Amino acid sequence: MERVPILKIGDILLVSIQVDMSDQTAVQLQEDLAERIVATGCHGVIIDITALDIVDSFVGRMLSTIASISKVLDAETVVVGMRPAVAITLVELGLSLNGIRTALNVERGMELIAASRADEWDAAADDEDTETTATA
C-alpha cells in the first residue's frame, strides 16, 4: 500500500497527493494526518491535489472527511492546486467541499491559513480587552 507523504512547514502540514487514492490509502492518510496534527500541534493543513487528473465523488468525500477531522483537532484545511476540469467535475457531481477553503497554489494556501490564524488572535485579544474593561 502506498502512503501519502505529510510534510511539516512551520505551523502547517502539507499533504501532496500524488498517488491514486484507494479506500485503504485514504483511510491511512486520515489516520496519519490526525496523528501528525496532534503530535505537532499544527493549526493548518494544506492538501495539494495538483497531480490529480480526476477527482471523483470518493476523493471529494475523502477531502471533506479529512477537513472535518482536522477541524475537530483545531486545524484548518485548505485544498490547493485544483485544475479547472476538476472544479467543473466537482460541481457537475453536486459535491460541495463543506468546511474546506480552496486556493490556487500552496503559497496562497499558506497565506489563507496565516490570515485566518491572525483573525483568531485578534478576536482573542478583543475578548481579553472586553473582559479587562468589564472588571475595571
Feature-to-residue mapping (PLM):
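STAS-typified acidic loop motif
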Residues: 2-30
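Amphipathic alpha-helical interaction surfaces in cytosolic regulatory modules
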Residues: 40-43, 47-96
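Short, conserved, surface-exposed binding loops centered on an aromatic residue
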Residues: 5-8, 35-39
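Extended, hydrophobic alpha-helical segments
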Residues: 30-37, 44-46, 64, 131-133
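Short acidic-hydrophobic, aromatic-tinged amphipathic segments that line or gate anion-handling sites
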Residues: 99-109
